[in-house]
Amino acid sequence: MTLLRDLLLLYINSLLFINPSIGENILVFLPTKTYSHFKPLEPLFQELAMRGHNVTVFSGFSLTKNISNYSSIVFSAEIEFVNIGMGNLRKQSRIYNWIYVHNELQNYFTQLISDNQLQELLSNKDTQFDLIFIELYHVDGVFALSHRFNCPIIGLSFQPVLPIYNWLIGNPTTFSYIPHVYLPFTDIMSFWKRIINAVFSIFTAAFYNFVSTKGYQKHVDLLLRQTESPKLNIEELSESLSLILAEFHFSSAYTRPNLPNVIDIAGIHIQSPKPLPQDLLDFLDQSEHGVIYVSLGTLIDPIHTDHLGLNLINVFRKLRQRVIWKWKKEFFHDVPKNVLIGEWFPQIDILNHPRCKLFISHGGYHSMLESIYSSVPILGIPFFTDQHHNTAIIEKLKIGKKASTEASEEDLLTAVKELLSNETFKRNSQHQSSIFRDRPMSPMDTAIYWTEYILRYKGASHMKSAVIDLYWFQYILLDIILFYSLIVLILLCILRIFFRMLTK
């Protein structure tokens, strides 16, 4: 009888500690069809599903795990600049790149809106969501989804937050020491660099307000055409942005102020290293002088980098180290014996192998974070967008070096040999790795907590700054400055009149 009573009490107590939350309906909207944007945060969506939430992912890729309450809607539209390759972009100015990428994404999203599956999702009145994740990357028309489903939005930034989204949510952005992510600067800028940073940042803001919003408004109208809602403008809809989950960490960039609704989750895509396939493990274990891992990202078309590729191959011929290179085999016919080429390798698992001595990368933000996490020095060869900014940070932290895509074979060989022989780079990498890993909560737990926080408090409007309700001239106190200037001017005029009267 006592045993039965104890079991009953244990059962009642266990019920008290069961999480009473009911699974919410979450829509993940990832319109840009780039795998490097989909793969890093998929573990977050999987974890939300495993916690009981119903997660629907609208993207260009199929899900990698089969979970009962985790479903996908896969679209087939392609971004034009991905189809033609990114090689030509590196030859253009940064303003040209900004405008080009913006225009291509605008045209692409106009086509994406007509996707039959998306239209079916929007027209089904029985479909409801409690929260929407959206990718913050030049496709702000998707803010209209918050009105259609009457729910808050969490923005996903796959790099340090772009200034336009900092301004949308009220996060302070000071040009004097916060560089634009598309510029090759760090937080320590000379006078001329600060001028360039301010001009470029103001240009992108003006472009957003006077050009981009017109395209976004068109997308809003198209998305809401099947609803009976009155015409809404993009400025009103952007207020539904409740939180930003950003892949940014002060140790891997620079220190900057953030509002409480801008959350750092840098490294969320990094999972514990897994055992390597036997052939790769043997290749690494048997490398007497270590291994160099090479990956130039997923968007770099080899046809636009043949000069760089040939120079790298010739450099590798002269090294004692073995090389694992993620590339297309058909572009090289005479591959050295110390080089293993394949179209895919488990990057984080290779970087964490003790024999991995150097990472040659395009300077992508995720690659930089994985290099820091794994304590591996990096040679960055940037092509476009934020990659120049990332490699500038690499040099600032002294965990690697930067090389041009047009670098000669001799220059590349010199840089590689210095990174392999100078132990300072390795020590700095280990130090940065220690700082990067030292956090009170893992990036995954942080993202889950704040996602469910927004769900609990229905958008958590109490976290929003009053700055989002100010005009730009109020934010920079221009009206106050003009007011006091006017008072001073009036006083000077009065004094002038008074002295004239005295001198008569």
Curated annotation (Swiss-Prot):
| Places the protein is found | Microsome membrane
Q: What is its EC number?
A: 2.4.1.-
Which residue ranges does the entry give as Cytoplasmic-facing topology?
A: 496-504
| Signal peptide (from-to) | 1-23
Q: Name one GO molecular function term.
A: UDP-glycosyltransferase activity
Alphabetical list of SUPFAM superfamilies matching this protein: UDP-Glycosyltransferase/glycogen phosphorylase
Q: One GO cellular component from the entry?
A: membrane
Q: Does the keyword Ligase apply?
A: no
Topological domains on the Lumenal side lie at 24-474
Membrane disposition: Single-pass type I membrane protein
Entry's transmembrane regions: 475-495
**Disulfide bond entries:** none
What's the superkingdom here?
Eukaryota
The protein's job, in short, is: Catalyzes the transfer of a glycosyl group from a UDP-sugar to an acceptor molecule.
The record's similarity note reads: Belongs to the UDP-glycosyltransferase family.
Protein name per UniProt: UDP-glycosyltransferase UGT4
Organism equals: Dactylopius coccus
Q: Which lineage is the organism of this entry classified under, starting from the top rank? A: Eukaryota, Metazoa, Ecdysozoa, Arthropoda, Hexapoda
Q: What gene is this protein a product of?
A: UGT4
